[in-house]
Amino acid sequence: MEEVEIEVSAPGDGHPDAVALPLTEDESTPRSDGDLAAQLQQLADDGELKGELGKTTLLHTDGETNARRVVVAGLGKRADVDADAVRTAASAVARRLGDVGGTLGWTLDESLPLSADEQARAVVEGAVLGSYSPARWKTQQKSGKRIAKIVFYGASNGVEQTAARATHVAKWVNWARDLANSPPNELTPEILAARAAELAGERLEVSALDPAQIDELGMGALSAVGRASANGPRLIVLRYEPAEAKGDVVLGLVGKAITFDAGGISLKPALKMYDMKGDMAGGAAVIAGTAAVAELQLPVHILTVVAAAENLVSGESFRPGDILRAANGKTIEITNTDAEGRLVLADAMWYARREGATHLLDVATLTGAMEVALGDLYAGLFANDDAWRDDILAAAQESGDHTWPFPLHRRYRRYVDSAYADLKNSSELRQGSPVLAAEFLREFAGDGPWAHIDMAGPGFLERSRGDYYTQRGGTGYGVRLIVELAQRLAA
């Protein structure tokens, strides 16, 4: 995976292929001097310069500056400028320069309501994520050049470290996007385990349990979901145990990785079933997030557990009416085989607790109702511990992987009661289904802080949401949040 080189320099130094000048809607022209300022003013007078968010204007300088090109990048209204706006502007610039690539200069603006560090981080993330293409399976690839280097003007040397960290993390976000976009014939549970195993090294240990080992441990929920497929389930385990880790916290990350979800006997409609390859986006996020933390050598223990399976239909399928026994001993009546994500997470969370996780966070594309509630920008967050919830919310806000808190209350628990078993996997009650799913998961979270992120909306997009750093398909949601959370735990 290629990374972007970072440099801090004085304005006018070097010869970048292009320089970006941010512009808000409150200004007519960006800050500049000399002949370029006059040219920009003329364009503004002609109505060609726009500070609207995501708008770009490209100028060829003809030697009037040290750069061959200048791109004016719209940030929107000054009062609304935040990290998301800077990411959007930077990704729009990266796409505009898709045929040029090379070195991009970016002028940091101290008058914006963001620190230089915050601006630089957002610029790098926007440029790297905005350069991503999901079309690697096309036989006719578009010719283009990537941005290989970003030079920041008007910054201190501390910005360089922040920006370098951001390019590491963004690289892993794109890696997770590649996994989520992979066709299901190229990404079975076994292949996903092999992809994870490629990440093993001196600082990261990776292993996987096969179907026989899953059965031996009594993981009846995960086993049942995966048994209809010729591609059996896997439980993928990553361990990052740096000697310099601080405190006794072991961050347990649990990911749902249904590499293709047909719904089982409770079959999904044919319409858009092809997007169910993305039902492993949570698993991709926790694998990539763990790899990013290991690469950054953050001093925190992480145990990552990914439950991978295909939810298909065959003579071996589990059925509505079946009663399964999960690894923690609880029995589950199956009322809907398309509520399989919570089943595989149940056994994976048990395993994470058994292996020593003190703080659990599960990440999953779990309920369509969450997408209805929050759309494609925010994920829903549930937690059994207020302090743990607040830690995750803070990491989400800082990282740009947005979450919104939802309630957990024991009075919801009765809706997943079963007349025949300890609980049922799906309620006939349509209202509040994300909350009921979280209440189901709570039964398997064990003792200690636990949180659940339902990323059904932002994890895999049906269409572009217009911010340029995401597009149709996998977004890599959760990777940046995980790294930020690990950073906070390591502090």
Regions found by a protein language model. Give the residues of each.
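Short amphipathic alpha-helical segment within the helicase RecA-like ATPase core
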Residues: 1-257
